[in-house]
């Protein structure tokens, strides 16, 4: 029952509640266990008295039923619990249309228990998954289409080692095309030297310079085998040894003003012996003439 209907007629409901109490229809005393229960109990008693007071007048109308419709109300706490609240959560009480107010509040039937959840299905849905990878969960596995065929895989670019592919910046990159795969080499793939940049000058230590000078005095021209030995002994590259000998031979020619450079030390000795022999012959010829 709405509070808008109860509050204006509270004085009449109070008188009707007193009349109902005198008639022997007492309200459940457990309503007054808590400090806020008298207000709730008084409202329920007033509502029950109003139904009895105005029920007969409402019965004269054909469209109105003789009894009020049922609507749920919160349950008062039992006498054993006091102000502690209800016995269980979710338990509600309903008020039927007829009967005394004390007997009208009955416990609603408990809701049916929820059925237990079904057991989880087996991982493979009853199908033996071990030994049958082709049909997992009852479905055929998808056939993967190869992205490349065997011929295309053979034609894929096989990148060489970075050290061998990079090479020196100043060297001709044509040999890179020969060593790499037969695929097309674009111009932007070739290593290019920076424009206007010169290679740094190589510096040699005193030990390296001394050993190179000794080798130059012994033989100004090195063979390929001897050049490899010298480069390994001095921790240099063959190119560095070759360039050093070229520069040293040019320096010797400028210092001696000679077009022909001695091939080896043996030729130098032979030249000296020839000069000495010529001088001796000249001295003998002078002695005979005198």
UniProtKB/Swiss-Prot annotation:
GO term, biological process aspect, one: anterior/posterior axis specification, embryo
One GO cellular component term: chromatin
Source species, domain of life: Eukaryota
Described purpose of this protein according to its UniProt entry: Sequence-specific transcription factor which is part of a developmental regulatory system that provides cells with specific positional identities on the anterior-posterior axis.
Pro residues bias (residue ranges): 108-124
Family: Belongs to the Antp homeobox family.
Cellular location(s): Nucleus
Gene Ontology MF terms in the entry: DNA-binding transcription activator activity, RNA polymerase II-specific; DNA-binding transcription factor activity, RNA polymerase II-specific; RNA polymerase II transcription regulatory region sequence-specific DNA binding; sequence-specific double-stranded DNA binding
Annotated region described as Disordered, given as residue ranges: 60-127, 161-200, 255-290
Gene3D superfamilies the UniProt entry points to: Homeodomain-like
DNA-binding segment(s): 197-256
Low complexity: bias regions: 60-69
InterPro entries, sorted: Antp_homeobox_TF (IPR050948), HD (IPR001356), HD_metazoa (IPR020479), Homeobox_Antennapedia_CS (IPR001827), Homeobox_CS (IPR017970), Homeodomain-like_sf (IPR009057)
Species of origin: Homo sapiens (Human)
Descriptive protein name: Homeobox protein Hox-D8
Biased composition (Basic and acidic residues): 255-278
Keywords: Developmental protein, DNA-binding, Homeobox, Nucleus, Transcription, Transcription regulation
One family name in Pfam for this protein: Homeodomain
